[in-house]
Amino acid sequence: MIDLKLLMNDFEEVAERLAKRHLEADFLEQARLLAGQYKAKKRESEELQAEQNAKSKLFGQYKKEGKEIDSLKAELDTLKIRLSEILPEVSVLERELESLALIIPNLPDEKTPIGRDEHDNIEIRRVLEPKMFDFRPKEHWELAEQNGWIEFDRGVKLAKSRFSVLRKEGARMSRALISYMLDFNHSRGFEEVVTPVIVNRETLLGTGQLPKFENDLFKISEVIEEEQGGEKGRGHELYLIPTAEVTLTNLYRDEIIPHDELPLLLTAHTPCFRKEAGSAGRDTRGIIRQHQFDKVELVALTKPEESDAIQQKMIDCASDLLSSLGLPHRLVQLCGGDLGFGASNTVDIEVWLPGQNCYREISSISNTRDFQARRAMIRYKDEDKKNRLVHTLNGSSLAVGRTLVAIMENYQNADGTIEIPEVLRRYL
């Protein structure tokens, strides 16, 4: 959540930074008007309360000195009535402003270039040269069917479209990749964590998936049958996680972390679940875009002054992991129009897929600054014993299915067989 004080006191700066995202002008105008109304009502209520306090003090003094108090009492009664009217108005406006703030995206920082969509992203550098094949490289779904690694029809039979079944070396390779990724991340200083994959609503509010992206989530409605506190049959909203970013970040929700425990560097493997509501017609073949997929995530909680350096550490970790697998890739700085909701800046890592003859995203490393920490109330106690918001960062290291795709396409032979990267062989 953006800083409401900044929204109210320096709206022009907020609007200028959000302009990088090409938000609709009507939405920003609504935010400006609501912030103005709240600020005016809040100021009026504070002035009335100050006047009430002053006159209450005077009332006590007059009464003690035996002075006439009837007119002063009448003024206090009027102030009391006015405050009883305005304070609920302030509360309503505050709730409306907080609700609006929950759907306002993060402010892009100075690293984020101006641009409307992915075509305006800026390539930073390329790592490893793509292999030149002396035959037409096949796409991963062709190789999967030929080798019996992935069964698409059976995935649909078991669930629906965008589900699949890994078999034989495909299943073993996926398991090997998960173990290798976790070991690699651990070697770079990230603590391995195992978290739930089902979470409550508050957890998703903390990292920003709710309320704006509820349609992208798989929701579970649990009814508690046993009587709890005299309430029977109470419903409880639960969701399947779209990424381990959600659970790793919210581990510290509503907590104050000692400054000497920062930075916290965490990694976890989880299955992830997404409805992909806005992806109809995109990547309908293969396993690039699935409703259920495995991912190994990196999350960091840091002091504000350390977050840029930690973001670079995370970028290097994911890039070096790809390099260790011999997979060509490039780093791309996302423009404002392509930036995720919670990110202040993002570097995408895109892996080369020779079968598709293009680079495809395999990791996004984002610095959210204090956006998520403010929503989730994750703070740390600094050296002066003051509570401050941490910065949170997240990124994949890596998306397992897409890494499997990249290995299949980059390590294929002319006869359709697939070599195994050397670093994975001890895991198989």
From Swiss-Prot:
Q: Which InterPro entries match?
A: aa-tRNA-synt_IIb (IPR002314), aa-tRNA-synth_II (IPR006195), aa-tRNA-synth_II/BPL/LPL (IPR045864), Ser-tRNA-ligase_type_1 (IPR002317), Ser-tRNA-synth_1_N (IPR015866), SerRS_1_N_sf (IPR042103), SerRS_core (IPR033729), tRNA-bd_arm (IPR010978)
Q: Which residues form a coiled coil?
A: none
Highest taxon in the source lineage: Bacteria
Gene Ontology CC: cytoplasm
Q: Which UniProt keywords apply?
A: Aminoacyl-tRNA synthetase, ATP-binding, Cytoplasm, Ligase, Nucleotide-binding, Protein biosynthesis
Give its E.C. classification number.
Answer: 6.1.1.11
Q: Give any single GO term for biological process.
A: seryl-tRNA aminoacylation
Query: Which Pfam families does the record associate with it?
Result: Seryl_tRNA_N (PF02403), tRNA-synt_2b (PF00587)
What are the TM regions of this chain, as residue ranges?
none
- Catalytic reactions on record: tRNA(Ser) + L-serine + ATP = L-seryl-tRNA(Ser) + AMP + diphosphate + H(+); tRNA(Sec) + L-serine + ATP = L-seryl-tRNA(Sec) + AMP + diphosphate + H(+)
Annotated residues that bind ATP are located at 274-276, 361-364
- Please name the GO terms that the record assigns under molecular function: ATP binding; serine-tRNA ligase activity
PROSITE patterns in the cross-refs = AA_TRNA_LIGASE_II
**What pathway or pathways are given for this protein in its record?**
Aminoacyl-tRNA biosynthesis; selenocysteinyl-tRNA(Sec) biosynthesis; L-seryl-tRNA(Sec) from L-serine and tRNA(Sec): step 1/1
Q: Where does L-serine bind?
A: 243-245, 297, 396
* CDD domains from the UniProt entry: SerRS_core
Location comes to: Cytoplasm
Q: Which family does it belong to?
A: Belongs to the class-II aminoacyl-tRNA synthetase family. Type-1 seryl-tRNA synthetase subfamily.
Q: Summarize subunit and interaction data from the UniProt record for this chain.
A: Homodimer. The tRNA molecule binds across the dimer.
Output the PANTHER family linked to this UniProt entry: SERINE--TRNA LIGASE, SERYL-TRNA SYNTHETASE
HAMAP family on file: Ser_tRNA_synth_type1
Domain statement: Consists of two distinct domains, a catalytic core and a N-terminal extension that is involved in tRNA binding.
What is the documented function of this protein? Catalyzes the attachment of serine to tRNA(Ser). Is also able to aminoacylate tRNA(Sec) with serine, to form the misacylated tRNA L-seryl-tRNA(Sec), which will be further converted into selenocysteinyl-tRNA(Sec).
Q: What is this protein called?
A: Serine--tRNA ligase
Q: Which gene encodes it?
A: serS
